[in-house]
């Protein structure tokens, strides 16, 4: 094997380690880096929390009450979802500075940046946000009305290019939920209620973002919310205690699973379980991420999914905005007990959490085997290597960003786009259970 004459000496030891060698197999690089990581570094990698572009030494007004430097340098966190963002050009410059700070840490593990949708007209933190400089497209429900896989895949390809231009490598979407409860507030983030349509468009969406597979030019999709967030009891919000239950009066739990198998076949490597409790569907009425029958038995074993399972945001500890932890069904457990239960269920990463200390303490206290952390960290490292972040996490000038916008690849409502007649009335389909979730 040829030895590179130049390399990124990420651990600053003056020699080429296997994990720094781009010519070695990914699995070999993963194992080498894993062997060099401390317990604290492993626990930090399992956090996936919010960050606001800006100064690294200022506590932001919204999000975790801790500086970016503290999270990256001292807590060893290297997965972040961006909240508010300046223009695309400013975001790209900030991203490179963030990667430079990560490069200077002990092992130089690069940052993975994720985001909720950035291409719609709404501006709702935690659901979808506009970003100046990106092209504008319909919400997923609008794509559902168009019903064209080619249009959705084209959108995904354009959005992929725009995400790459500013450093976003994980899309916290698509939503593969079936909106069978018309009062549910997240309907606009879905492709609709009809499983066949949602299945086709979800797979097309993933193909657009990931291409032939997640690599240096792909954006990894985190499909959500397994096993389907649509049957929300009374349409209430599962972020809150009063909306923690999912109901299936039509006994259609299996119907809501239909889009996920094809999503995995399309290459989705990350999954986010839903907040809610699937009432009466498993032996224990607890939230999805705490439910071993949902995560291990259904997702891991039945579907054979071996990718990353990242919880929805704030299921273990609450945030400073006054929202309690969404630990539905296990509210009585301590923080450490909640971590143990989710790990036993089979999750890999914790959305919205920025305190890795309880995980490390569980190992120190003899209540958790470090090998269990290794299992999840392997998955997280593997994806970073596949995306090429260890070889070059930085991005170049974004002066060509407008070339990716609608003028080059026009959305279907622009005059230059081909027209497609859509029937003014769409009869209900027998396969859709509608509100009978």
Q: Which residues are covered by each model-predicted region?
A:
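Second-shell residues forming the walls of enzyme active-site clefts
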Residues: 38, 94-107, 122, 129, ...
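Short, acidic/polar
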Residues: 58-73, 151-159, 250-262, 332-339
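Glycine-rich tight-turn/loop motif centered on a GG-T
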Residues: 81-85, 131-150, 182-201, 235-254, ...
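Flexible hinge/switch segments at interdomain interfaces of large molecular machines
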Residues: 128-134, 173-180, 227-236, 390-402, ...
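Preference for extracellular/luminal or secreted protein segments
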Residues: 1-68, 301, 317-437
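Alpha-helix termination/capping residues and helix-transition junctions
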Residues: 69-77, 165, 265, 302-303, ...
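Active-site-proximal beta-strand/loop segments in catalytic clefts of secreted hydrolases
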Residues: 46-52, 81-86, 115-118, 173-177, ...
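N-terminal hydrophobic targeting/anchoring segments and the immediately downstream early-domain regions
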Residues: 1-145, 153, 159, 164, ...
């Amino acid at each position: 094997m040829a030895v590179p004459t130049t390399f990124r000496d990420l651990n600053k030891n003056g020699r080429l380690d296997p994990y720094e060698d781009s010519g070695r197999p990914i699995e070999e690089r993963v194992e080498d880096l894993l062997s060099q990581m401390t317990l604290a570094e492993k626990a930090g990698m399992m956090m996936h929390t919010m960050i606001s572009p800006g100064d690294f030494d200022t506590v932001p007004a919204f999000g975790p009450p801790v500086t970016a430097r503290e999270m990256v340098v001292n807590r060893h966190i290297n997965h972040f979802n961006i909240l508010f963002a300046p223009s695309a050009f400013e975001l790209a410059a900030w991203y490179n500075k963030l990667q430079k700070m990560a490069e200077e840490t002990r092992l130089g593990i690069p940052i993975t940046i994720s985001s909720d949708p950035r291409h719609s007209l709404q501006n709702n933190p935690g659901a979808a946000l506009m970003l100046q400089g990106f092209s504008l497209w319909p919400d997923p429900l609008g794509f559902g009305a168009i019903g064209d896989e080619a249009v959705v895949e084209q959108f995904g390809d354009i959005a992929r290019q725009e995400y790459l231009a500013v450093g976003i490598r994980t899309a916290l979407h698509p939503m593969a939920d079936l909106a069978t409860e018309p009062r549910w507030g997240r309907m606009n983030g879905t492709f609709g209620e009809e499983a066949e349509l949602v299945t086709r468009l979800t797979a097309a969406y993933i193909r657009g973002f990931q291409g032939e597979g997640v690599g240096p030019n792909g954006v990894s999709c985190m499909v959500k919310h397994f096993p389907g967030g649509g049957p929300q009891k009374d349409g209430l919000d599962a972020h809150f205690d009063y909306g923690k239950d999912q109901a299936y009066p039509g006994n259609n739990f299996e119907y809501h699973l239909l889009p996920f198998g094809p999503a995995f076949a399309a290459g989705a490597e990350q999954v986010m379980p839903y907040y809610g409790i699937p009432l009466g569907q498993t032996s224990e009425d607890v939230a999805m991420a705490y439910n071993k029958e949902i995560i291990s038995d259904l997702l891991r074993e039945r579907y054979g999914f071996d990718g990353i399972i990242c919880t929805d945001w704030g299921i273990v500890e609450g945030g400073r905005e006054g929202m309690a932890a969404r630990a539905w069904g296990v509210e009585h457990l301590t923080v450490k007990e909640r971590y143990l239960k989710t790990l036993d269920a089979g999750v890999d990463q914790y959305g919205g959490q920025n305190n890795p200390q309880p995980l490390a303490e569980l190992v120190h206290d003899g209540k958790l085997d470090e090998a269990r952390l290794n299992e999840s960290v392997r998955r997280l490292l593997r994806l970073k290597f596949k995306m090429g972040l260890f070889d070059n996490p930085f991005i170049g000038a974004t002066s060509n960003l407008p070339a990716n916008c609608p003028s080059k690849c026009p959305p279907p409502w622009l005059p230059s786009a081909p027209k497609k007649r859509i029937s003014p009335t769409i009869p209900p389909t027998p396969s859709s259970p509608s509100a009978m979730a």
